Amino acid sequence: KKNVFNKKVKYWTLERDGKDITVLSAVGHLYSLTPDNPKDKVYFDLHWAPLFEIDKKYKNYTKDYVRAIKKYAKDADSYIHACDYDIEGTLIGYHALKYGCGEDALKKSSRMKFSTLTKKDIVEAYENRIPIDRHQVDSGVARHILDFYFGVNISKALMKSVSAAKKRFLKLSAGRVQTPTLSILVDREKEIKKFVPEPYWLIKALLDGEIEADHVDGKIFDKTRAEEIFSNCENSDAAVDKIKYSNSTTKPPVPFNLGGLQSEAYNVFGFSPKKTQTIAQSLYTAGYTSYPRTSSQKLPESLDFKSIFLQLSKNSEFRTHISALPAKLKPNEGKKEDAAHPAIHPTGILPDKLDKDELKIYELIVYRFISV
């Protein structure tokens, strides 16, 4: 049953195995770091606080989510953490439990782990819950603390330094990832500006109007030499000197992780990485594909390939390619692993309606899954 708290926050109630269950949501992080003493020149003493208390202007909308969690968490017998199974998702749910439900809630909590939003996977994750991964929690906490130390403290120092030199205030920012990345871009831009292009010539022969042959010297940097070769070859007959046959085996591509999907979508469609990730997330939320923010290039043995292919075969275009697959299905996996999630793959559920860009990404994922 769908309900609404305070006219803003949706939540659901249901019964399973004789238990009343309330399903509540967060809206990203509900808690963040803030300094113990805002007047300190450098911030190293920090604590976690609700976002709506830290940023009342832009994050006030999170208040009702925190209130809903606190209200419906009272007197609960147990708690289930079902946020995305990655470091950030784990930290979001952990803080909701610790600060929204209370410290004791952590002792009565379990974790659902799933990589697709199909009914089958959700039920399996519910029935096979695991403990909350404290390593993921610690990793998330450490990242947030380091981001705060670098981002806030160095940004303050940077603005103070530049303002003193320029005799005026400038709002600047630095960050743990942002600043080194900017440095790489600056170095690359300097290389580009220093580059002096050197002209060269390519000589090609068009044979029988169909075959294009390159001169054996490839790039020719001497114009006189290029003109001499061209003059000698112009209007001449070509003779086949040797024919060589060889067989080569091409391995199938590896399954998509997020980076691979973004790279391929850019090469094929010109989509920006952000656009690809947004579309992949919407496909995951709709239950059509698996969790997108994964670094894995591996597909687990537990994945029911035959069932997925059977469902995908309801689409005639997919069926044409699937029917050409060998009887024994063994994917060509890459080296990269992710303990939390497998490589991106279709769930088998065919979309009812997608816009043209969503369809492009969905088909890209499906055809890569078939081809591996």
Q: What is each of the regions a protein language model found here?
A:
Residues E88-I92, D138, A142, S173, ...:
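Hydrophobic (often cysteine-bearing) scaffold residues that line and stabilize catalytic clefts
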Residues Y61, A68, K74-D75, L117-D208, ...:
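C-terminal or mid-to-C-terminal helical accessory/interaction module adjacent to the motor/catalytic core
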Residues A26, A82-D84, L206, G259, ...:
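Generic beta-strand/beta-sheet core signal
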Residues C101-K108, V268-P273, A286:
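Secondary-structure transition/capping motifs at alpha-helix termini
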